[in-house]
Design a protein with these regions (language model features):
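Short, surface-exposed, charged amphipathic helix/loop patches that serve as local interaction elements
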Residues: 2-111
Length: 111
């Protein structure tokens, strides 16, 4: 069964479930992407979050709330998608923030 499509207030960004439409086409390793499928967020487990925190810590990151950091969110996004972390690291700033916010909002029950 299809879930509802959401139109964000400015009218130009449409999302379906946990599929994030990019603000402009993004080239990664010779392929053009117009969306990021984060539907795997529904399958994330606490052990994935623990592992993401370890990866975040080993990279030198520190935060009292690591779930709010972009790097942590990208580790989770990698686990929730078919994309490598380099895919997320290469996103334009606006789309990178939208991915981070999507993951963060998912954790805190706002997605």
């Amino acid at each position: 069964m299809d879930k509802e499509v959401q139109v964000v207030e400015n009218g130009d960004i449409i999302e379906k479930d946990n599929v994030l439409m990019l603000t402009k086409p993004y080239m990664f390793e010779g392929t053009e992407y117009t969306e990021v499928d984060l539907s795997g967020l529904d399958n994330i487990k606490a052990r994935d979050m623990i592992e993401a925190e370890k990866i975040y810590g080993r990279s030198g990151g520190f935060s009292f709330i690591p779930e709010m950091s972009m790097e942590y969110a990208f580790v989770i996004a990698t686990r929730a998608s078919k994309y490598p972390i380099e895919f997320f690291q290469g996103l334009p700033p606006r789309d990178a923030m939208r991915v981070k916010n999507k993951v963060t909002n998912f954790f805190f029950g706002m997605a």
